[in-house]
Amino acid sequence: MNADTTFAVVDLETTGTSVKDGDRMIQFGCALVRHGKIIQTISQMINPDRSVPQTIQRLTGISPERLVAAPYFDEVAPALHQVLTKTVFVAHNVNFDYPFLNAEFERIGLPKLQLEAIDTVELAQVLLPEISSFRLSDLTTHFAIQHDNPHQADSDATSTAKLLLQLKARFQALPTPTQQALIQRHDGFIRETGDYLKMIASPPRPLKKEFVQVGPLVLRRPTTTPTDLATAGAYPATELAKKHLLQPRYRFRKAQAKMMDAIFTHAQKTEIPLFIEAGTGLGKTLGYLLPYAYLATPEQKLVVATST
Protein backbone atom coordinates (compact mmCIF):
# COMPACT_ATOMS: atom_id res chain seq x y z
CA MET A 1 0.00 0.00 0.00
CA ASN A 2 1.08 3.58 -0.60
CA ALA A 3 -0.24 7.14 -0.61
CA ASP A 4 -2.21 6.49 -3.82
CA THR A 5 -3.90 3.32 -2.57
CA THR A 6 -7.68 3.03 -2.64
CA PHE A 7 -9.06 1.64 0.61
CA ALA A 8 -12.28 -0.35 0.34
CA VAL A 9 -14.04 -0.03 3.68
CA VAL A 10 -16.53 -2.88 3.73
CA ASP A 11 -19.35 -4.01 5.98
CA LEU A 12 -21.55 -7.07 5.51
CA GLU A 13 -24.90 -7.97 6.98
CA THR A 14 -25.42 -11.72 6.98
CA THR A 15 -27.83 -14.39 8.20
CA GLY A 16 -25.10 -15.80 10.46
CA THR A 17 -21.38 -16.30 10.78
CA SER A 18 -20.52 -19.30 8.58
CA VAL A 19 -20.90 -19.74 4.82
CA LYS A 20 -20.15 -23.46 5.25
CA ASP A 21 -23.17 -23.78 7.54
CA GLY A 22 -25.42 -22.18 4.94
CA ASP A 23 -25.31 -18.56 6.08
CA ARG A 24 -25.55 -15.94 3.37
CA MET A 25 -25.09 -12.23 2.85
CA ILE A 26 -28.15 -9.98 2.90
CA GLN A 27 -26.47 -6.59 2.41
CA PHE A 28 -23.11 -5.36 1.12
CA GLY A 29 -21.86 -1.88 1.99
CA CYS A 30 -18.63 -0.27 0.84
CA ALA A 31 -17.03 3.17 1.04
CA LEU A 32 -13.99 3.74 -1.17
CA VAL A 33 -11.39 6.05 0.37
CA ARG A 34 -8.54 7.64 -1.54
CA HIS A 35 -6.23 10.52 -0.59
CA GLY A 36 -8.08 10.97 2.70
CA LYS A 37 -11.57 11.34 1.16
CA ILE A 38 -14.56 9.10 0.56
CA ILE A 39 -14.79 9.01 -3.23
CA GLN A 40 -17.61 6.49 -3.72
CA THR A 41 -20.14 4.47 -1.73
CA ILE A 42 -21.86 1.22 -2.68
CA SER A 43 -24.98 -0.26 -1.11
CA GLN A 44 -26.42 -3.53 -2.35
CA MET A 45 -29.24 -5.63 -0.91
CA ILE A 46 -28.82 -9.34 -1.65
CA ASN A 47 -31.44 -12.08 -1.70
CA PRO A 48 -29.99 -14.85 0.51
CA ASP A 49 -32.35 -17.50 -0.92
CA ARG A 50 -33.01 -18.69 2.60
CA SER A 51 -34.86 -17.50 5.69
CA VAL A 52 -33.47 -14.63 7.75
CA PRO A 53 -33.45 -15.29 11.52
CA GLN A 54 -35.65 -13.03 13.60
CA THR A 55 -32.62 -11.90 15.62
CA ILE A 56 -30.94 -10.66 12.43
CA GLN A 57 -34.12 -8.92 11.30
CA ARG A 58 -34.38 -7.10 14.64
CA LEU A 59 -30.67 -6.22 14.67
CA THR A 60 -30.49 -4.86 11.13
CA GLY A 61 -34.03 -3.69 10.54
CA ILE A 62 -33.95 -5.59 7.22
CA SER A 63 -37.13 -7.57 6.64
CA PRO A 64 -37.54 -10.52 4.21
CA GLU A 65 -39.90 -8.36 2.15
CA ARG A 66 -37.04 -5.99 1.33
CA LEU A 67 -34.94 -8.89 0.06
CA VAL A 68 -37.46 -10.64 -2.18
CA ALA A 69 -36.79 -8.37 -5.16
CA ALA A 70 -33.04 -8.09 -4.50
CA PRO A 71 -30.58 -9.90 -6.80
CA TYR A 72 -28.89 -13.11 -5.74
CA PHE A 73 -25.20 -12.89 -4.84
CA ASP A 74 -24.02 -14.59 -8.03
CA GLU A 75 -25.70 -11.81 -10.03
CA VAL A 76 -23.77 -8.97 -8.36
CA ALA A 77 -20.60 -10.78 -7.28
CA PRO A 78 -18.55 -10.19 -10.48
CA ALA A 79 -19.06 -6.42 -10.23
CA LEU A 80 -18.23 -6.38 -6.51
CA HIS A 81 -15.15 -8.53 -7.10
CA GLN A 82 -13.92 -6.11 -9.76
CA VAL A 83 -14.48 -3.06 -7.53
CA LEU A 84 -12.48 -4.60 -4.70
CA THR A 85 -9.58 -5.85 -6.80
CA LYS A 86 -6.39 -3.81 -6.26
CA THR A 87 -7.74 -2.12 -3.13
CA VAL A 88 -6.78 -2.50 0.52
CA PHE A 89 -9.65 -4.14 2.40
CA VAL A 90 -10.75 -2.40 5.61
CA ALA A 91 -13.41 -3.51 8.08
CA HIS A 92 -14.44 -3.15 11.70
CA ASN A 93 -13.48 -6.71 12.71
CA VAL A 94 -11.80 -7.57 9.43
CA ASN A 95 -11.35 -11.22 10.36
CA PHE A 96 -15.09 -11.68 9.95
CA ASP A 97 -16.01 -9.62 6.88
CA TYR A 98 -13.00 -10.48 4.71
CA PRO A 99 -13.08 -14.30 5.11
CA PHE A 100 -16.89 -14.38 4.84
CA LEU A 101 -16.86 -12.39 1.60
CA ASN A 102 -14.09 -14.56 0.14
CA ALA A 103 -16.02 -17.70 1.09
CA GLU A 104 -19.03 -16.32 -0.79
CA PHE A 105 -16.89 -15.59 -3.85
CA GLU A 106 -15.46 -19.12 -3.76
CA ARG A 107 -18.94 -20.62 -3.35
CA ILE A 108 -20.04 -19.25 -6.73
CA GLY A 109 -16.77 -20.02 -8.50
CA LEU A 110 -14.91 -16.70 -8.32
CA PRO A 111 -11.30 -16.57 -7.08
CA LYS A 112 -10.60 -15.42 -3.55
CA LEU A 113 -9.47 -11.82 -3.20
CA GLN A 114 -5.78 -11.55 -2.35
CA LEU A 115 -5.74 -8.17 -0.64
CA GLU A 116 -3.92 -6.44 2.15
CA ALA A 117 -6.37 -5.86 4.99
CA ILE A 118 -6.74 -3.48 7.95
CA ASP A 119 -8.78 -3.85 11.14
CA THR A 120 -10.25 -0.64 12.58
CA VAL A 121 -11.11 -2.38 15.86
CA GLU A 122 -7.43 -3.00 16.53
CA LEU A 123 -6.47 0.50 15.39
CA ALA A 124 -8.95 1.95 17.88
CA GLN A 125 -7.73 -0.30 20.68
CA VAL A 126 -4.15 0.87 20.14
CA LEU A 127 -4.87 4.56 19.59
CA LEU A 128 -7.73 5.03 22.08
CA PRO A 129 -6.69 3.00 25.13
CA GLU A 130 -8.61 5.32 27.43
CA ILE A 131 -12.10 4.40 26.19
CA SER A 132 -14.09 1.42 27.45
CA SER A 133 -15.88 0.18 24.32
CA PHE A 134 -14.72 -0.37 20.76
CA ARG A 135 -18.10 -1.08 19.21
CA LEU A 136 -18.62 0.93 16.06
CA SER A 137 -21.60 2.78 17.53
CA ASP A 138 -19.57 3.84 20.58
CA LEU A 139 -16.58 4.94 18.50
CA THR A 140 -18.74 7.02 16.19
CA THR A 141 -20.25 8.69 19.25
CA HIS A 142 -16.75 9.34 20.61
CA PHE A 143 -15.74 11.12 17.39
CA ALA A 144 -19.17 12.72 16.79
CA ILE A 145 -19.50 10.81 13.49
CA GLN A 146 -23.04 10.76 12.13
CA HIS A 147 -24.20 7.14 12.07
CA ASP A 148 -27.84 7.05 11.08
CA ASN A 149 -28.50 3.32 10.72
CA PRO A 150 -26.26 1.10 12.87
CA HIS A 151 -26.14 -2.54 11.74
CA GLN A 152 -27.02 -1.67 8.17
CA ALA A 153 -24.07 -2.31 5.89
CA ASP A 154 -24.10 0.96 3.96
CA SER A 155 -24.26 3.13 7.09
CA ASP A 156 -21.69 0.98 8.91
CA ALA A 157 -19.26 1.08 5.97
CA THR A 158 -19.44 4.86 5.62
CA SER A 159 -19.08 5.34 9.37
CA THR A 160 -16.11 2.97 9.47
CA ALA A 161 -14.47 4.93 6.64
CA LYS A 162 -14.86 8.15 8.63
CA LEU A 163 -13.52 6.35 11.70
CA LEU A 164 -10.46 5.22 9.71
CA LEU A 165 -9.69 8.84 8.81
CA GLN A 166 -10.10 9.95 12.43
CA LEU A 167 -7.76 7.21 13.63
CA LYS A 168 -5.23 8.16 10.96
CA ALA A 169 -5.23 11.75 12.24
CA ARG A 170 -4.96 10.49 15.81
CA PHE A 171 -1.89 8.40 14.98
CA GLN A 172 -0.19 11.19 13.02
CA ALA A 173 -0.65 13.56 15.97
CA LEU A 174 1.32 11.26 18.28
CA PRO A 175 4.92 12.22 19.14
CA THR A 176 7.49 10.74 16.78
CA PRO A 177 8.96 8.29 19.35
CA THR A 178 5.48 6.92 20.07
CA GLN A 179 4.75 6.44 16.37
CA GLN A 180 8.09 4.69 15.93
CA ALA A 181 7.47 2.42 18.92
CA LEU A 182 4.17 1.26 17.42
CA ILE A 183 5.70 0.79 13.97
CA GLN A 184 8.44 -1.41 15.44
CA ARG A 185 5.69 -3.78 16.58
CA HIS A 186 3.88 -3.83 13.24
CA ASP A 187 4.31 -7.59 12.82
CA GLY A 188 2.10 -8.17 15.86
CA PHE A 189 -0.95 -6.47 14.37
CA ILE A 190 -3.87 -8.19 12.63
CA ARG A 191 -3.12 -8.76 8.93
CA GLU A 192 -1.58 -5.56 7.46
CA THR A 193 -2.85 -3.14 10.12
CA GLY A 194 0.71 -2.53 11.31
CA ASP A 195 1.92 -1.89 7.76
CA TYR A 196 -0.79 0.76 7.45
CA LEU A 197 0.61 2.59 10.50
CA LYS A 198 4.07 2.39 8.97
CA MET A 199 2.77 3.90 5.73
CA ILE A 200 0.91 6.84 7.34
CA ALA A 201 3.61 7.76 9.89
CA SER A 202 4.46 11.46 10.04
CA PRO A 203 7.96 12.74 9.21
CA PRO A 204 10.15 12.93 12.35
CA ARG A 205 9.65 16.11 14.35
CA PRO A 206 10.98 17.40 17.68
CA LEU A 207 8.92 16.91 20.82
CA LYS A 208 6.63 19.71 21.83
CA LYS A 209 7.54 21.52 25.03
CA GLU A 210 4.73 19.89 26.99
CA PHE A 211 6.24 16.41 26.48
CA VAL A 212 9.35 14.72 27.86
CA GLN A 213 10.89 11.42 26.75
CA VAL A 214 11.79 8.94 29.47
CA GLY A 215 13.49 5.93 27.89
CA PRO A 216 11.12 4.63 25.20
CA LEU A 217 8.14 6.48 26.69
CA VAL A 218 6.90 9.97 25.89
CA LEU A 219 5.14 11.55 28.86
CA ARG A 220 3.32 14.81 29.33
CA ARG A 221 5.32 17.07 31.61
CA PRO A 222 3.65 17.43 35.00
CA THR A 223 2.09 20.81 35.49
CA THR A 224 1.62 22.11 38.99
CA THR A 225 0.34 25.33 40.41
CA PRO A 226 2.36 26.17 43.52
CA THR A 227 0.23 27.17 46.47
CA ASP A 228 1.70 29.26 49.26
CA LEU A 229 -0.32 27.93 52.18
CA ALA A 230 1.29 30.41 54.53
CA THR A 231 -0.59 33.16 52.72
CA ALA A 232 -3.67 31.09 51.90
CA GLY A 233 -5.34 31.73 55.23
CA ALA A 234 -5.14 30.51 58.79
CA TYR A 235 -4.01 27.01 59.70
CA PRO A 236 -7.09 24.72 59.84
CA ALA A 237 -7.13 24.22 63.57
CA THR A 238 -10.58 22.64 63.86
CA GLU A 239 -11.94 19.34 62.60
CA LEU A 240 -14.39 21.18 60.34
CA ALA A 241 -11.62 23.34 58.84
CA LYS A 242 -9.46 20.30 58.07
CA LYS A 243 -12.36 18.49 56.40
CA HIS A 244 -13.21 21.57 54.35
CA LEU A 245 -9.59 21.87 53.16
CA LEU A 246 -8.95 18.24 52.31
CA GLN A 247 -12.25 16.69 51.27
CA PRO A 248 -13.73 14.99 49.26
CA ARG A 249 -10.97 12.33 49.34
CA TYR A 250 -9.85 12.96 52.91
CA ARG A 251 -11.04 10.70 55.74
CA PHE A 252 -10.75 12.49 59.06
CA ARG A 253 -8.65 10.70 61.68
CA LYS A 254 -8.66 12.14 65.16
CA ALA A 255 -5.13 10.95 66.04
CA GLN A 256 -3.74 12.38 62.81
CA ALA A 257 -5.40 15.74 63.47
CA LYS A 258 -3.93 15.73 66.98
CA MET A 259 -0.47 15.14 65.48
CA MET A 260 -0.94 18.03 63.03
CA ASP A 261 -1.96 20.43 65.79
CA ALA A 262 0.90 19.35 68.04
CA ILE A 263 3.50 19.93 65.31
CA PHE A 264 2.04 23.30 64.31
CA THR A 265 1.89 24.55 67.90
CA HIS A 266 5.32 23.20 68.83
CA ALA A 267 7.07 24.75 65.82
CA GLN A 268 5.90 28.23 66.78
CA LYS A 269 6.47 28.23 70.54
CA THR A 270 9.53 26.25 71.54
CA GLU A 271 12.84 24.84 70.43
CA ILE A 272 12.50 21.82 72.71
CA PRO A 273 12.43 18.62 70.63
CA LEU A 274 9.03 17.04 70.12
CA PHE A 275 8.72 13.26 70.18
CA ILE A 276 5.57 11.67 68.76
CA GLU A 277 4.78 7.95 68.76
CA ALA A 278 2.33 7.15 65.97
CA GLY A 279 1.04 3.75 64.95
CA THR A 280 0.88 2.26 61.47
CA GLY A 281 -1.91 3.67 59.34
CA LEU A 282 -2.26 6.93 61.22
CA GLY A 283 -1.20 8.99 58.21
CA LYS A 284 2.07 10.38 59.52
CA THR A 285 3.26 11.90 56.22
CA LEU A 286 0.27 14.19 55.89
CA GLY A 287 0.36 14.61 59.65
CA TYR A 288 3.64 16.53 59.54
CA LEU A 289 3.60 17.95 56.01
CA LEU A 290 0.32 19.85 56.34
CA PRO A 291 1.33 21.96 59.36
CA TYR A 292 4.82 22.53 57.96
CA ALA A 293 3.28 23.73 54.68
CA TYR A 294 1.59 26.52 56.64
CA LEU A 295 4.83 27.40 58.41
CA ALA A 296 7.24 27.43 55.45
CA THR A 297 7.71 30.62 53.44
CA PRO A 298 10.19 31.69 50.75
CA GLU A 299 12.08 33.52 53.51
CA GLN A 300 11.83 30.78 56.14
CA LYS A 301 12.37 27.43 54.51
CA LEU A 302 11.84 24.08 56.20
CA VAL A 303 13.68 20.83 55.54
CA VAL A 304 12.03 17.53 56.41
CA ALA A 305 14.32 14.50 56.64
CA THR A 306 12.76 11.06 56.91
CA SER A 307 13.89 7.48 56.51
CA THR A 308 10.52 6.25 55.25
Locations of the language-model features?
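Post-Walker A helix-loop "phosphate-sensing" segment adjacent to the P-loop in P-loop NTPases
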Residues: 294-300
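Short, glycine/acidic-enriched loop or turn micro-motifs at the edges of active sites
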Residues: 14-16, 96, 122, 159, ...
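Walker A/P-loop
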Residues: 268-291, 302
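Acidic two-metal-ion nuclease catalytic site recognized across multiple nuclease folds
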Residues: 2, 166-238
